Amino acid sequence: MYHIWIKFLAAWIFLKRFNGVHVMQAKAPMYRNEPFLVFWNAPTTQCRLRYKVDLDLKTFHIVSNANDSLSGSAVTIFYPNHLGVYPHIDDRGHFFHGIIPQNESLTKHLNKSKSDINRIIPLKAFHGLGVIDWENWRPQWDRNWGSKNVYRNRSIQFARDLHPELSEDKIRRLAKKEYEKAAKSFMRDTLLLAEEMRPDGYWGYYLYPDCQNYDYKTKGDQYTGKCPEIEMSRNDQLLWLWRDSTALFPNVYLEIILRSSDNALKFVHHRLKEAMRIASMAREDYALPVFAYARPFYAYTFEPLTQEDLVTTVGETAAMGAAGIVFWGSMQYASTVDSCQKVKKYMNGPLGRYIVNVTTAAKICSRVLCRKNGRCVRKHSDSNAFLHLFPESFRIMVYANATEKKVIVKGKLELENLIYLRENFMCQCYQGWKGLYCEEYSIKDIRKI
């Protein structure tokens, strides 16, 4: 009964947010007057330091760490071997730290995690994205299918070894109970520790929430992109995780089979829609900021996204009201000077220009529609309205000389442009502001700083 009530409440909040007059308030953006941010989370330090190739990230409005490193003050990602003693089996079949969470000391894990956080993020005033990437197992028993079924089997054997007197049915039930209890403790306590140590960071788990809408390979033209109801229900049951998160990090990685297809947009749209639904149910005071993880190249390839798929990923993420998008990449991006040059060429071409287009359009809409006190969100989440610069009114110009490169957007908003924005977008006000256009200051809604 409890889960039914939670699901009803989440659906009601979501409908009110996207299709009604009231929109749940948002946390103020990480940087003032920057409603939509683009982050770089790829290990491309070698491009700059070894090959002397500057990817021009800042030129194109991309937030990155010093020397374009994988982790730093802007965004830090913790892989399994970077944070505490995370029990798991890796892709090669190697065992780590007891394999299952109920077979490892939580105290030992938290003590090690504290040391790791101090080492990796020495700045106590850290204000960036803190992303924990634990993908080996899921905290819900029923979601450990396929290769993850090993965690269920190990848990059953663990319970059997401790309680040989129990029947197999009781052992299975005990194994599920103990596994989910330990998994919850590991994930929740790790998150709370990170937030206690670096309270100004945006903390959450990569790929949470997930939508499990991966059936585009088998459905073809019948693919809808919608998240299965059972998966949405399971996400509802993770309310404990959403309540303790300060940001959500779903992914919208595109495989090459989706290139420039309708299915690509369906896939991304419904993953974002589910993330926005969860963001609205996590807290009572504001919707959690959503930062979608994307790749500038198709997954498992070094082929850049088409212009259409840049719209599908970056454009869709901005239009749905996310706080930003994070471009993740592999070591391949900086493996050779040619790789670095390929990334740079893409950055100086379609990728960089489109990022400038969307980030600038989001700022303009925030200014003219929401008085810089909120971000623009589609009035109807399933529409095809995007936050793009109007080509008849604006031009993106790149200037470069021997010492610097800069991008300038020239133009002004025309009346018909403003009408379009008002017809297709509404304001999601930041905390402390309310009204149709975020024009009313509300002291009682201001968060404590």
Swiss-Prot record:
Expressed by the venom gland. Residues 427-438 form the EGF-like domain. Disulfide bonds join C47-C340, C211-C227, C365-C376, C370-C427, C429-C438. It is an enzyme of class 3 (hydrolase). The active site is at E135. Residues 1-23 form the signal peptide. GO terms for biological process: carbohydrate metabolic process; hyaluronan catabolic process. Its EC number is 3.2.1.35. Glycans are attached at N67, N103, N111, N153, N357, N401. Belongs to the glycosyl hydrolase 56 family. Monomer. This is Hyaluronidase-1. It comes from Cerastes cerastes.
